[in-house]
Amino acid sequence: MMKIVIDLMGADHGVLPIIEGVSRALENKSFSAVLVGDKDKATPFISKELASKVEMIHTQDYIKMEEAATEAIKRKESSIYLGMDILKNGADALISAGHSGATMGLATLRLGRIKGVERPAICTLMPSVGKRPSVLLDAGANTDCKPEYLIDFALMGYEYAKSVLHYDSPKVGLLSNGEEDIKGNMLVKETHKMLKAYDFFYGNVEGSDIFKGVVDVVVCDGFMGNVVLKTTEGVASAIGSIFKDEIKSSFKSKMGALMLRNAFDILKQKTDYAEYGGAPLLGVNKSVIISHGKSNARAVECAIYQAISAVESQVCLRITQAFESLKPSVSAHQSDQQDA
């Protein structure tokens, strides 16, 4: 049976939403859950039925948000270190809503990078007007990048879209300040030249194209990706607040909202971060899902489904195979340019 490790510590709202999310997921999927965290804090929220389905690893130590990510390397009794150790030694996936930097650092050091991957990347799903979301990476793991890193992100995003999301022939776009080949900073221009070696490359895309579904995968450095992600979250939250205020403003607005309830439900589902679960860390040798610090039970539940899909689709193996077969084409392309 698939074994999934869940870090209980460090989330904004404590252990309760995480435990509730695990409980809901176990009602719908068959997997073995290992909870790592403070047993004294967790036990009051774990029913007898749930206790019979999960394994509890006790520790009170965890990496606080204000602490440096490097602390995780020293703190071998912290929840994320213990969880990563369990993952390394036989578990199939790990989910954490705690310190994302600590999770990324330990995943890279303890699990190792897939051969050929220079930098792992955070991959996140973005809402789209189409029937399926867009994939964005890097969403914050690497703020300073070289073109070679973005090539890695493109390959990993392509494989994730194809293997886990089952997108047929996904197209990859490079985020820029214009669609034309000449647009972008030096990083974008150099990456664009290298990505031309791949059939899946669509070309440059603008920020608005992310939500239009112009391409399936959008590649950028982690600084830009995180700005896009946080801006999107802020806009979605602001629009939601505006809607609520306007609906409450008059009886006519309330009646109109009732008539549009189904449409609002669909809109919420498409724009609610919780429905997307978490963000996979691609490029390490096991499946790691980084959840939002403010994750509610639904977000944790969906993150578990995400982890199950990643393991079942063997995404780490698919990325390994992609780097063996596809990445050499970049070197060949660069050699051709030099010869020319």
UniProtKB/Swiss-Prot annotation:
The organism sits in which domain of life? Bacteria
Report the EC code(s) recorded for this entry.
2.3.1.274
Q: Which reaction does it catalyse?
A: a fatty acyl-[ACP] + phosphate = an acyl phosphate + holo-[ACP]
Signal peptide bounds: none
Pathway per its UniProt entry is:
Lipid metabolism; phospholipid metabolism
Is Transferase tagged as a keyword?
A: yes
Keywords, comma-separated and alphabetical: Cytoplasm, Lipid biosynthesis, Lipid metabolism, Phospholipid biosynthesis, Phospholipid metabolism, Transferase
Q: Where in the cell is it found?
A: Cytoplasm
What is this enzyme's class at the first EC digit?
Answer: transferase
Coiled-coil regions in this chain? none
Q: For this chain's UniProt record, which GO biological process terms are given? A: fatty acid biosynthetic process; phospholipid biosynthetic process
Q: Which InterPro entries match?
A: FA_synthesis, Phospholipid_synth_PlsX-like
Q: Which GO terms describe its cellular component?
A: cytoplasm
One GO MF term, please?
Answer: phosphate:acyl-[acyl carrier protein] acyltransferase activity
Q: Which Pfam families match?
A: FA_synthesis
Q: Would the keyword Methyltransferase be found if you checked this record's keyword annotation?
A: no
- Oligomeric state and partners? Homodimer. Probably interacts with PlsY.
Protein family per UniProt: Belongs to the PlsX family.
Q: What does this protein do?
A: Catalyzes the reversible formation of acyl-phosphate (acyl-PO(4)) from acyl-[acyl-carrier-protein] (acyl-ACP). This enzyme utilizes acyl-ACP as fatty acyl donor, but not acyl-CoA.
Name of this chain's protein: Phosphate acyltransferase
Please report the organism this UniProt entry assigns to the protein. Helicobacter pylori (strain HPAG1)
Q: What is the lineage of its organism?
A: Bacteria, Pseudomonadati, Campylobacterota, Epsilonproteobacteria, Campylobacterales
